[in-house]
Structures are given as C-alpha cells and as structure tokens.
C-alpha cells in the first residue's frame, strides 16, 4: 500500500492535525512513458506553509484532497518504456508526501549518490541550498569585507548562506537559539560569532559584534529579530528575507 498525506483544509495561522489526512491507497502502475518511484526522503521546507494558502502566488496552491507537495528523492522501481530513466536510477524532484508515485520525469533529475549522501540532494544541493546560494549572492550581492548577519543560522538555509558569505571574505554573525546551536554555528560552520536569542539581548549582541552596523542581513525568521536587524543597518545596505509563513511581528 501507498501511504499519502492529503491536504484537507486550509489553515489559519499554524496548521493543525485536522489540516491533513493520512490515507493508504494502492501503489500506482506507471503508464506508457512513466516510471514508478519509491520515496526515500522528503524535504520539509518552510515554503510548504505558503503552498497550502488559498490564492495564487509564485506557484499554484496545493488543491484540497491532493497529496501535499514536497521535494523528494527516491529510486525508480519500475519503468514503462521511459526514454530517459531506468530502473535503479535515483531521482529528485516533486514527488509529494507519499511513499510511491508515478511520473513522466518532467521536473525530475537523476543524481549520483556515489558523490555525496543521498540526503544532500534535498538539503545543501536542493531547495534549501539554492535558496541560500541565490539569496546571499544574487539578492544580497555580498562582497569581501561586508558585515553579514544570518538569522536561523543553524538551519538548512542559514547554515549554507553563512558559509558562502565566509568563503566570499565577509564577517559573518549568526543568530540561533541556545548555546549548543551557537557553538555549532561558530565552531563547525565557521561563523565569526553567534548571538543566542534565547539567552541574550539581540540589540546588545548586535552592538557588540557589529559596532559599525550591518551591510547585509539574510532574514529567515522575521518578527522581533528582523526589527533589531533593521535598526543595525548601515545606510543604503541590503536586507534579503525569506517569506513569513505563520507569524508576524507586532510592531
């Protein structure tokens, strides 16, 4: 059987249990020119919250009673004369939150799991990594010597964005929650410093680590942290942010 997660209603604020329904259906058979894929991993991305809102955005919303959209990586276990993929190929693309799915291959790409672990293709080499790469380079337009602040620094996007900024010769300050995450951000990821928003005052931390102000802020969280970062900007510099999903600043 094929377990699938269906969208049952559009949430207001945070999704709740009745937003979804877990169902079991027969494993589908691939039609002519299709393949059957067994899902190994699903990419859980913040963008998924936006996909279940009503109304068109940069992408059509997930329809009610449809399988929840998600990036996946899996192995082809059956082919019906597919011109490009064969049984045993590992592919990544839009597979949805389900154990098996069929596809024509449109929007899917074969990956080489001998180069890096499979999960990297839905992490640093997938949507989170691409968000970080294009956000920090194309939107933030960082340059050597910039002071860059990254919120959500221990997360999938923030961790990659910060490392790219370090490679470009920037001074990089992270914001994360808790001493363990901050230690990881500095000691493992190579950030210059990290502000623990759970135990430190953000404004004081920014004054300590960015006394001359910020050049670029990569915002992953919004809210009060965004407010503090905006107050620390050098005049005329850049703030690039990901979308707010379920929470908003009160001022």
Residue ranges and their predicted role:
Residues 26-44, 52-97:
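Glycine-rich beta-strand-centered segment in the early N-terminal region that forms part
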Residues 201-212:
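Short amphipathic alpha-helix with an adjacent loop that forms part of the alpha/beta core around
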Residues 122-200:
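Mid-domain Rossmann-like dinucleotide-binding core that forms the NAD(H)/NADP(H) cofactor-binding site
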Residues 186, 224-251:
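Glycine-rich phosphate-binding loop and adjacent beta-alpha segment
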Residues 79-84, 174-184, 198, 202, ...:
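Short glycine/proline-centered loop/turn elements that form peptide/ligand docking sites
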Residues 92, 149, 195, 217-218:
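N-terminal Rossmann-like NAD(P) cofactor-binding module of classical short-chain dehydrogenase/reductase
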Residues 68-75, 80, 84-152:
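NAD(P)H dinucleotide-binding glycine-rich loop of Rossmann-like/cofactor-binding domains
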Residues 142, 210, 233-234:
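A generic alpha-to-beta junction signature in SAM-dependent methyltransferases
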